[in-house]
Swiss-Prot record:
Descriptive protein name: Polyribonucleotide nucleotidyltransferase
EC numbers, comma separated: 2.7.7.8
Domain spans labelled KH: 555-614
InterPro entries: ExoRNase_PH_dom1 (IPR001247), ExoRNase_PH_dom2 (IPR015847), ExoRNase_PH_dom2_sf (IPR036345), KH_dom (IPR004087), KH_dom_type_1 (IPR004088), KH_dom_type_1_sf (IPR036612), NA-bd_OB-fold (IPR012340), PNPase (IPR012162)
GO biological process: mRNA catabolic process; RNA processing
Gene3D superfamilies in the record: GHMP Kinase, N-terminal domain, K Homology domain, type 1, Nucleic acid-binding proteins
Length: 704
């Protein structure tokens, strides 16, 4: 019998009980934690390689998040009936976990680490993201791998002016905010949020609230860590060669300082490369056996120090701007002739070509996740081709970064999108990043707002986004507006804010150091507001409201109402009627159970014809009305005549003509068009018709 020694920690977290268990499952991993919040359970495993691959100059951390359909009691769809490549949602959750844990590994640690989070049980009211992050923090903390945790995580909602900790899926429906925050005991590390244009102080309050509440998580993980008591790896950061550091400083500092006064990105990069190569060649000439990777790393550190020192000392930024200045803007709407909406947004050396395509309800994205099925009418896809940074590279399916940036831009815009009742179209945005030097996701937000307006989508107001940075040395700090790519890499915090003039719609924050106070975040958000309003002013000069009409190339959706009981008549046997309608009129027709019919076509005449035929099919037979009918069958006692699609009536032999009719075929033949008057509709729905009464002889006596 295998002996297991489970160690369990449980605590109340908001409205849920969280349980962390280790020692039973996956015991060959460096650490494994079964983490539960209510009935939502994830298995988190951590494995790290004990030895570093020689020559590696980066930290190979991999976070894999996988949702198993059995967790929700489902069998996967598709031919193979098993889970395949990660969905967009799984990719986003993996990134959400990766971002706060990555900066907690010590500098110089380059051993491979893999974290695998498997969702094994799910309550449809409790999303797995928060418990996945808590489980990851716990597993890393007890693994023995060098890790400066533990880390806490919380989700914050905002309903009726009050914050809610870890709201359920149902509570989020009424929430004006969905904010995820992760951090250590003393510092916030990561924020990801979507909001309904909330003020800066409400957003900052949510960050502080979430960080305060997650202290209970951190304490529980510390207790678990103490009880497991696994020895920490005997690892220390490689000692720095101070002699080499001094030589590199002498060889390259002046040249790098000069190079970073060149404002054009490509020219600056070229000169930085010249300075670095010259320093490297000089060092290798002196010592041919010198470690080139170590030299490259120290040159990178010197480069970072030079740029940060310039900013902290109050000198102009890399491209000559002051800290709160936004780069030059060039904004155009309606740049492509056949797309439904388009824009070209340029901010300095960052540029996005954004298109908007309108479709019908059937074009909406249908998503079947373990949390249930739902439809997404608004899609935003972000593409980052290698030419945007002057490089060659692979082109194909979107990478994790592209999916993450697209979702951030989607969050920024979603709050201003019209409802299905206001605008019954599916909307797909594609942002092609054609140039990049920082903040391409926020350029996508601005370009999307412009393209939507150009397409005639009635969004509530314009939305702009801005990326902010921060450089902090001791008590001195500088907040930077509209950061360049270099400032992003060399800074201590980067955060992206999207919003309207009234408030924030999306906030993403990644903090690399401790000591970022609430006051610093307050200053940064205030500076971001000023930059956002400046960009909105420029955007509004290009287009300040949605066009009065949609593009002539877009499908026009016309909505009519029919009796819900008539839906089956419009569909027809096996869908024959609606199929014929769509093929013969060239329209797209969608039916709702409540009798709403949406007809989409870029041809107005085709739409009118489809409506006419639907109205014919669904029309009620009215007693006393004269119809143009067609004879469909002749019998001994009369003829059956179609007066409306699917509606036949009988003209009795006595109602065909004034004179006596001996043989129906002498007067009528199949296919003949005749005028008939509806005399009666009985309880069974049978229709009695008369040709005599429809004849233009008002004075003629009625037939008995």
């Amino acid at each position: 019998m295998v002996h297991v020694n489970p160690i369990v920690k449980s605590f109340q977290y908001g409205q849920h009980t969280v349980t962390l268990e280790t020692g039973v499952i996956a015991r060959q991993a460096d650490a494994a934690v079964l983490a539960s919040m209510g009935d939502t359970t994830v298995l988190v495993t951590v494995v790290g390689k004990k030895f570093e691959e020689p020559g590696r100059d980066f930290f190979p951390l991999t976070v894999n998040y996988q949702e198993k359909t059995y967790a929700a009691g489902k069998i996967p769809g598709g031919f193979f009936k098993r889970e395949g490549r990660p969905s967009e949602g799984e990719t986003l959750t993996a990134r959400l976990i990766d971002r706060p844990i990555r900066p907690l590994f010590p500098n110089g640690f380059k051993n491979e680490v893999q974290v695998i989070i498997t969702v094994v049980s799910v309550d449809p009211e409790i999303s797995p993201e928060v418990i996945s992050m808590i489980g990851t923090s716990a597993a890393l903390s007890i693994s023995g791998i060098p890790f400066n945790g533990p880390l806490g995580s919380a989700r914050v909602g905002y309903v009726n002016g009050e914050y809610i900790l870890n709201p359920t899926v149902s509570q989020l429906v009424d929430s004006q905010l969905e904010l995820s925050v992760a951090g250590t005991e003393s510092a916030v590390l990561m924020v990801e949020s979507e909001a309904s244009a909330l003020p800066e102080e409400v957003m900052l309050g949510a960050v502080v609230y979430g960080h305060d509440q997650q202290q209970v998580v951190i304490q529980a993980i510390k207790e678990l860590q103490a009880e497991v008591n696994k020895p920490v790896w005997d690892w220390s950061a490689p000692a720095q060669d101070e002699t080499l550091v001094a030589k590199i400083k002498d060889l390259a500092e002046a040249g790098l300082t000069e190079a970073y006064q060149i404002e054009v990105k490509q020219d600056r990069y070229a000169q930085v490369g010249v300075v670095k190569n010259a320093a490297k060649e000089a060092l290798l000439a002196e010592n041919p056996d010198a470690n080139t990777r170590e030299i490259d790393g120290l040159l990178g550190s010197l480069e970072k120090k030079v740029v940060r020192g310039r900013i902290i000392s109050g000198q102009p930024r890399i491209d000559g701007r002051e800290p709160d200045m936004v780069r030059a803007l060039n904004v155009m709407a309606g740049v492509l002739p056949r797309t439904h909406g388009s824009s070209l947004f340029t901010r300095g050396e960052t540029q996005a070509l954004v298109t908007c395509t309108l479709g019908t309800e059937r074009d909406a994205q249908k998503i079947d996740s373990i949390m249930g099925e739902y439809t997404n009418r608004f899609m935003l896809h972000y593409n980052f081709p290698p030419y945007s940074v002057g490089e060659t590279g692979m082109v194909g399916s979107p990478k994790r970064r592209e999916i993450g940036h697209g979702k951030l831009a989607w969050r920024g815009i979603n709050a201003v999108m019209p409802t299905a009742e206001e605008f019954p179209y599916s909307v797909r945005i594609v942002s092609e990043i054609t140039e990049s030097n920082g903040s391409s996701s926020m350029a996508s937000v601005c370009g999307t707002s412009l393209a939507l307006m150009d397409a005639g989508v009635p969004i509530k107001t314009s939305v702009a986004g801005i990326a902010m940075g921060l450089v902090k040395e001791g008590d001195d700090f500088v907040v930077l507006s509209d950061i360049l790519g270099d400032e992003d890499h060399l800074g201590d915090m980067d955060f992206k804010v999207a919003g309207t003039r009234d408030g924030i719609t999306a906030l993403q924050m990644d903090i690399k150091i401790e000591g970022i106070t609430k006051e610093i975040m307050q200053i940064a958000l205030k500076q971001a507001y000023g930059a956002r309003v400046h960009i909105l002013d420029v955007m509004d000069r290009a287009i300040s409201g949605h066009r009065g009409d949609i593009s002539e190339h877009a499908p026009r959706i016309t909505t009519i109402k029919i009796n819900p009981e008539k839906i089956r008549d419009v569909i027809g046997k096996g869908g024959a009627t609606i199929r014929a309608l769509t093929e013969e009129t060239g329209t797209t027709i969608e039916l709702d159970d409540d009798g709403t019919v949406k007809i989409a076509s870029s041809n107005g005449e085709a739409t009118k014809e489809a409506i006419r035929r639907i109205e014919e099919i669904t029309a009620e037979v009215e007693v006393g009305t004269v119809y143009n009918g067609k004879v469909v069958r002749i019998v001994d006692f009369g003829a059956f005549v179609t007066i409306l699609p699917g509606k036949d009536g009988l003209v009795h032999i006595s109602q065909i003509a004034e004179e006596r009719v001996a043989n129906v075929s002498d007067y009528l033949e199949v296919g003949q068009e005749v005028k008939v008057k509806v005399m009666e509709v009985d309880r069974q729905g049978r229709v009695r018709l008369s040709m005599k009464e429809a004849a233009p002889k008002a004075e003629a006596p009625a037939a008995e």
